[in-house]
Amino acid sequence: MTSNPTLLPTYASINLTALAHNLSCIKQYLAPDCQVMAIVKANAYGHGVVETAQALARQGIERFAVASLDEGIALRQAGLSTSIVVLGALFEEQIPDLVAHRLTPVVSDAHILHILTKAAQSHPASYPIHLKVETGMGRLGFSPAELSPLFDEMLLRGPLQVEGLMTHLADADGKNSSVTERQLETFCAVLSQIRQRGITLPFVHTANSAAIVRFPNTHFSLVRPGIMLYGYHTLPDTVPAPDLRPVLSLRTTVVQLRTIPQGGTVSYNGTFVATRPTRIAVLPIGYADGYSRRLSHRGSVLIQGRRAPIVGLVCMDMVMVDVTDIPPVHIGEAVTLIGQQGEESIWANEVAGWIGTISYEVLCGIGSRVPRIYESA
């Protein structure tokens, strides 16, 4: 990583001021005693997990969640000492490393629960875990019938401390709220059974980004914002949207220019055929950097604050755009693929729309060849 983006033809700029702003927006929906567990899985949705977590910690966040063991270990090795919850599936062979790095697992099956119980016996204090209830996502988790009896067993006493109970909402951003309401009803029934046993759970959490805005009754004691931290939402048009600011901009530089005649072709298989003399700018970014090949012949980039359409097939390392109507363009000219340039902007949700996906995939797909440049909050 370098602090001088002019030395890099292609880079992602991460605006930590926007990140802090988005966190403030999220907190406006919460009661004062409701905590935030920041979701920084998938390299913080492509933004860089270590720097993003460190920036959020400076903003007072004390709880983080990742998808996998290796993501949690990376944060520990970077010096993050606060709570790190591993949301994804765990395997028996991973338990020693999990315990060694003081990572908090979300447990979804009885076998891993047994293994954790044995591993935690050598731990000097009760080892915290969260339990996941499957309420309608059809993915990880104990069924309600499986979970409640566990609290009557010795399995959840002694070396383990059940610190949290969670579920994952499948349709919090859907137009119909009935799916979320059914899931919440199932979850609350399990929670009630546990509390009737006199068991206190410090952290109860169900709310993802969309639920934070739409369903205040899902907040409980902890919420799990992900995409909203990074400046995007998937709320229906009928729901007032928060004032979020996209955090990541993707930029590159014109590396070569050429004029092709009418009938000339661009890129593999000659799929673009010029209908007039056409000025082509070559950009040093491609699908190996996470700029999808599905963007071939669709979408645009910004040069001089104007849209230049992508022409031909996106290559592994290069993209070509038509700059005929943006004279004069020069080698070394700044190009914005995601972000704002002048009065015009292209954000990840628009790029996602061009290729039939979601902003999450666009952001997470930006590869390791693209350096991240951090603008301090």
Q: Could you say what each language-model-derived stretch is?
A:
Residues 2-20, 24, 28, 70-71, ...:
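Active-site anion/phosphate-binding pocket segments in diverse small-molecule metabolic enzymes
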Residues 5-13, 20-21, 28, 32-205:
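Active-site-proximal beta-alpha core segment in soluble small-molecule metabolic enzymes
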